[in-house]
């Protein structure tokens, strides 16, 4: 129904003030919902930035070098603990970035690997 009122009010010259009021009300209605959405987005980005700063410092604490540009790292991903064995590379800015080569183990898989270390060592010695 509001669309028909707009058409009628725009066609008649006597209701110009009514159409201006309608336009102002519509503008206010449109502006009001947008403001909270923008505030939420900026809050989310600031939270993301602060969490990324925290994760980068904790990532350094949980990285153990096992070779040239190869590391074992312990991290939290979507609420799950993962043990990564991964190669890293240096980007042009000098930052270390994770490479494609690597594997992520959950704690159960990590325990199974640790239990089989002696068997793996024996197999390496035989070769």
Curated annotation (Swiss-Prot):
There is a cross-link at residue 68 (Glycyl lysine isopeptide (Lys-Gly) (interchain with G-Cter in SUMO2)). Residues 31-44 have a biased composition (Basic and acidic residues). Residues 77-101 are annotated as: Interaction with ssDNA. Residues 7-16, 46-57 have a biased composition (Low complexity). The modification N6-acetyllysine is found at residues 35, 53, 68. The keyword Transcription applies. One of its GO terms (biological process) is negative regulation of DNA metabolic process. It is found in: Nucleus. Its main location: nucleus. GO terms for molecular function: identical protein binding; RNA binding; RNA polymerase II cis-regulatory region sequence-specific DNA binding; single-stranded DNA binding; transcription coactivator activity. Pfam families: PC4. The record marks 50-51 as: Cleavage. SUPFAM superfamilies: ssDNA-binding transcriptional regulator domain. One of its GO terms (cellular component) is nucleoplasm. There is a cross-link at residue 68 (Glycyl lysine isopeptide (Lys-Gly) (interchain with G-Cter in SUMO1)). Keywords: Acetylation, Activator, DNA-binding, Isopeptide bond, Nucleus, Phosphoprotein, Transcription, Transcription regulation, Ubl conjugation. General coactivator that functions cooperatively with TAFs and mediates functional interactions between upstream activators and the general transcriptional machinery. May be involved in stabilizing the multiprotein transcription complex. Binds single-stranded DNA. Also binds, in vitro, non-specifically to double-stranded DNA (ds DNA). Belongs to the transcriptional coactivator PC4 family. This is Activated RNA polymerase II transcriptional coactivator p15. It comes from Homo sapiens. The lineage of its organism: Eukaryota, Metazoa, Chordata, Craniata, Vertebrata.
